[in-house]
Amino acid sequence: MKLSKIALEAEANALAALFNGGFMDYFDGTQPPSADFSVSTQTLGVTLVFGNPAFKPAVGGVLTANALITGVVTREIKVAWARCYKADHQTALVDLTVGVADSADIIMPTTHLVPGLQVPVSRFSFSIQNWKGPLT
């Protein structure tokens, strides 16, 4: 299956709407296998808030976030991953890796977060890939 540009952008924009007024929480510890698994022993260090709308309209299946509200660290942690939620702050949407290397989904100058530190997001974007897998 190869989606048209209009179908790809409609898919991306539908996903983007789920983030409106949502949250991005930064945690320490082991990242769960997927966003369908509950947070258990991981410690929350900081929460950022998505705007409403959270993203600009998709272009070529690429979503670029509008400004997020900067979070202030509440607990000292070594951040390892983040989870994004809908506006209810209950419904998980996506988990992201956090690190100092380009291989991380979220790149930070340091993963050591201390109380009072402000955590901004300078840019947040991702691409909805045009699925080309085999049909069975």
Label the model's feature ranges.
Residues 1-82, 87-136:
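Small cysteine-rich, disulfide-bonded extracellular modules of the LU/uPAR three-finger superfamily
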